[in-house]
Curated annotation (Swiss-Prot):
It is an enzyme of class 2 (transferase). The keyword Metal-binding does not apply. Transfers and isomerizes the ribose moiety from AdoMet to the 7-aminomethyl group of 7-deazaguanine (preQ1-tRNA) to give epoxyqueuosine (oQ-tRNA). Keywords: Cytoplasm, Queuosine biosynthesis, S-adenosyl-L-methionine, Transferase. It comes from Pseudomonas fluorescens (strain SBW25). It is found in: Cytoplasm. This is S-adenosylmethionine:tRNA ribosyltransferase-isomerase. It comes from the Bacteria. Belongs to the QueA family. GO terms for molecular function: S-adenosylmethionine:tRNA ribosyltransferase-isomerase activity.
Length: 349
């Protein structure tokens, strides 16, 4: 399969650069994985697609204000995007500057703070901060908005680029399907008899990196840390036993569950995953998916195509464009039931 198979033309006006006034105000495009039928709804209509006994699995990672600005001791300006917190003082980060800092050099952080460049690990820099890094980021860091939201972060992004159920600090990008849920909607879901469970996957900046090969089978995924607990495994098993459906909220929840079930059986798992889900890969756990609209030629679009079928996914995206849906992190959403026999790019509608 070629990366070019997953391209589409998106008008710039459909890129959502700000969230709507209310989380639940988004639109919802539903895709029946069996029939391929589409329906245009509001996000609150999601309740109509849920059944008592279903299990919704959310990613409870919390975004850290991971973008810092500063300067080298020589005076040159730089920008830091923390990719992963290693311990209380050390991080791996992307550093953008005219010249890369050298090991042993000092970095002065705007707003107060200092770091030392310890070592370089391929594209990432290991930095050691003089003070504890998480309090420093909370104090002077900026929310790491995706590159397609081409504006400076605002105070409101500290709330809106965060799910209402986020708990575990560590992500540098939000699990955006969860941004549509407010507490009253979560309460209504529970009142309908739908169970909930929480995995953790700390989304990395690599989620925005383009696929740089022609054939997707040659692509190597970036690594991200996740945890699927025994409680989640028990909840999934109970759901399946009662005939319920496992509904993943977001591609990160899919990647978490399917990473923990690579041999076909879901087991507790804690550690890094580089799972790459593209058309042809089977799903062992997830039955339905809530997800946003993703970038052309992205691994996330490939995952959705594996779940819903390639022709059905691309047709749904064209319908979304034709009907003015808002795309990407602050955009609208889809609800997809899994296609039992998904087709690839070679099997067009």
């Amino acid at each position: 399969m070629r990366v070019a198979d997953f391209t589409f033309e998106l008008p710039d006006s459909l890129i959502a650069r700000h969230p709507l006034a209310e989380r639940r105000a988004s639109r919802l495009l539903t895709l029946d994985g069996v029939s391929g039928a589409l329906a245009h709804r509001q996000f609150t209509d999601l309740l109509e697609h849920l059944r008592p006994g279903d299990l919704m699995v959310f990613n409870n990672t919390r975004v850290i204000p991971a973008r810092l600005f500063g300067q080298k001791a020589s005076g040159g300006k730089l920008e830091i995007l923390v990719e992963r917190v290693l311990d209380s003082h050390r991080v791996l980060a992307h550093v953008r500057s005219s010249k890369s800092p050298k090991p042993g050099s000092s970095i002065l952080i705007d707003g107060g703070g200092e770091a030392e460049m310890v070592a370089r690990h391929d594209a990432l820099f290991e930095l050691k901060f003089a003070e504890e890094v998480l309090p420093l980021l909370e104090r002077v860091g900026h929310m790491p908005l995706p590159p397609y939201i081409d504006r400076p972060d605002e105070d409101s992004d500290r709330e809106r680029y965060q799910t209402v159920y986020s708990q575990r600090l560590g992500a540098v990008a939000a699990p955006t399907a969860g941004l549509h849920f407010d507490q009253p909607l979560l309460d209504a879901i529970a009142a309908k008899g739908v169970e909930t469970a929480y995995v953790t996957l700390h989304v990395g900046a690599g989620t925005f990196q383009p696929v740089r090969v022609d054939n997707i089978e040659d692509h190597h995924m970036h690594s991200e840390w996740l945890e699927v607990s025994q409680d989640v495994v028990d909840a999934v098993e109970a759901c399946k036993a009662r005939g319920g459906r496992v509904i993943a909220v977001g591609t990160t929840s899919v990647r978490s569950l399917e990473s923990a079930a690579r041999d076909g059986v879901l087991k507790p798992f804690s550690g890094d995953t580089d799972i790459f889900i593209y058309p042809g890969r089977p799903f062992h756990v997830v039955d339905c998916l809530v997800t946003n609209f993703h970038l052309p030629e992205s691994t996330l679009l490939m995952l959705v195509s594996a779940f819903a079928g390639y022709p059905e996914t691309m047709a749904a995206y064209q319908a979304a464009i034709d009907n003015g849906y808002r795309f990407f992190s602050y955009g609208d959403a889809m609800f997809i039931t899994r296609n039992p026999a998904p087709r690839g790019p070679e099997e067009q509608l």
